[in-house]
């Protein structure tokens, strides 16, 4: 069953200006070290950060909170599987909120899709509850 859906659109040019103006202070407040390392290795640094910003916004909406109620930017982190598929990793209050939304006997799965077409970066997040597999008899 679907527990939450969120989407967000971020302007890459605005992200580039924000990075230039606030630099490390902004990066350290919003992005995890893993996200920063990924972005700084990319040719399109601002685009990579903008997609991750949009993913955090979309995830907070899917959690039903937006960026309030104690949720921190770094409680939501975008990583990539070896295949390149993006995944959301939740910690802190975001993980607590996810656990509180998940019905008994289910596990939560957070799906994320990222895309960009300059000057826009977009993220879409779906939180799904799947029934837990019954233990073998």
Swiss-Prot record:
<dbReference type="InterPro" id="IPR037143">
    <property type="entry name" value="4-PPantetheinyl_Trfase_dom_sf"/>
</dbReference>
<keyword id="KW-0963">Cytoplasm</keyword>
<keyword id="KW-0276">Fatty acid metabolism</keyword>
<keyword id="KW-0444">Lipid biosynthesis</keyword>
<dbReference type="GO" id="GO:0005737">
    <property type="term" value="C:cytoplasm"/>
</dbReference>
<keyword id="KW-0479">Metal-binding</keyword>
<protein>
    <recommendedName>
        <fullName>Holo-[acyl-carrier-protein] synthase</fullName>
        <ecNumber>2.7.8.7</ecNumber>
    </recommendedName>
</protein>
<dbReference type="InterPro" id="IPR008278">
    <property type="entry name" value="4-PPantetheinyl_Trfase_dom"/>
</dbReference>
<comment type="similarity">
    <text>Belongs to the P-Pant transferase superfamily. AcpS family.</text>
</comment>
<feature type="binding site">
    <location>
        <position position="8"/>
    </location>
    <ligand>
        <name>Mg(2+)</name>
    </ligand>
</feature>
<dbReference type="GO" id="GO:0006633">
    <property type="term" value="P:fatty acid biosynthetic process"/>
</dbReference>
<keyword id="KW-0460">Magnesium</keyword>
<dbReference type="GO" id="GO:0008897">
    <property type="term" value="F:holo-[acyl-carrier-protein] synthase activity"/>
</dbReference>
<dbReference type="GO" id="GO:0000287">
    <property type="term" value="F:magnesium ion binding"/>
</dbReference>
<dbReference type="Pfam" id="PF01648">
    <property type="entry name" value="ACPS"/>
</dbReference>
<feature type="binding site">
    <location>
        <position position="57"/>
    </location>
    <ligand>
        <name>Mg(2+)</name>
    </ligand>
</feature>
<comment type="function">
    <text>Transfers the 4'-phosphopantetheine moiety from coenzyme A to a Ser of acyl-carrier-protein.</text>
</comment>
<dbReference type="InterPro" id="IPR002582">
    <property type="entry name" value="ACPS"/>
</dbReference>
<keyword id="KW-0443">Lipid metabolism</keyword>
<dbReference type="InterPro" id="IPR004568">
    <property type="entry name" value="Ppantetheine-prot_Trfase_dom"/>
</dbReference>
<keyword id="KW-0808">Transferase</keyword>
<keyword id="KW-0275">Fatty acid biosynthesis</keyword>
